[in-house]
A protein has these predicted regions:
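Class I S-adenosyl-L-methionine-dependent methyltransferase catalytic core
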Residues: 1-271
Length: 271
């Protein structure tokens, strides 16, 4: 099912704001971008600066970008501003509707964006080796329950790390199929804490992407700012002796070429 949007929100094409692109593996955006139709009121969405940097680095105009857990549409907005075609998928109809609304603006040169209600574990509607770039930001287990248990298959309902990673592996396998060889898949994922102890969610997810055949190109540390829960958790952290997690991992994976000799990069593979 495709999420429908109405007429354009703006009469004139929007201009692409210029931002300084990143060149290190530590990214920090104290002020999240608010240009075009970007909004910060969808809990858990990522800063548009992340999408801008990844799309600029790993794709070209006219390429097709896929976000299989599109949320409020950050990836699709930036894809449109940068003249990339894009497909966004979300299992939550409310999120799909938000994304469809977010891309209701004119831009030149023209490109095509589409939002579908669907499950990232089934990308059979896409051809194999058809996508130029994947960029996504999945739920961090059940830290934020986007559908409150009402949508079957919603990853944000899963509280078990092994179960969550099993489902992520299914998604990773689908992404590996539809991504073109020698192209890139970027995923922003953070960690969590249980019983005052660190749970390495990000690295567990990373291992599942390596398992299906991806190789690790980059591990970018993204500093978190303006977290609404920081003030609430600070006294408890000081009292109980643990540190607040204030970073996320932006993993960039590459799909190897057919028959590619991976011996030189074997330590970036599933070993």
């Amino acid at each position: 099912m495709t999420a429908q949007a109405g007429q354009y929100l703006f009469d004139e094409p929007l201009k692409v704001p210029t931002i300084q692109l990143e060149y290190t593996t530590v990214w920090s955006f104290p002020e999240r971008g608010s240009w075009a139709t970007h909004k910060s009121d969808y809990r858990g969405n990522f800063a548009p600066q992340i999408a801008r940097n990844i799309i600029e680095m790993y794709s070209r105009k006219g390429d097709c970008v896929l976000d299989p857990m599109v949320g409020a549409g950050t990836t699709l907005i930036e894809a449109k501003l940068l003249a990339r075609d894009a497909v966004g998928i979300d299992i939550n109809p409310d999120a799909a509707k938000l994304s469809a609304e977010a891309i209701r603006f004119k831009h030149s040169p023209a490109s095509r964006q589409e939002v579908k209600i669907g499950d990232a574990r089934d990308l059979s509607f896409l051809d194999d080796d058809s996508i130029d770039l994947v960029l996504t930001h999945p739920p961090y287990m059940n830290i934020i329950k986007y559908s409150n248990g009402q949508i079957e298959g919603d990853l944000s309902n899963i509280g078990s790390l092994p179960k969550f990673c099993d489902e992520i592996e299914k998604i990773a396998a689908q992404l590996f199929k539809v991504l073109k060889p020698d192209k890139y898949c970027a995923i922003l994922i953070g960690d969590t804490r249980k019983g005052r102890h660190f749970v390495p969610l990000a690295f567990s997810v990373m291992q599942r992407f390596l398992k299906v055949g991806f190789v690790l190109k980059e591990d970018i540390i993204k500093i978190q700012h303006n977290c609404t829960m920081t003030g609430r958790w600070r006294p408890k952290a000081l009292k109980d002796g643990f540190y607040l997690i204030m970073h996320e991992h932006l993993f960039v994976f590459r799909k190897p070429r057919p028959g590619e000799n991976l011996s030189r990069i074997r330590y970036s593979t599933n070993i």
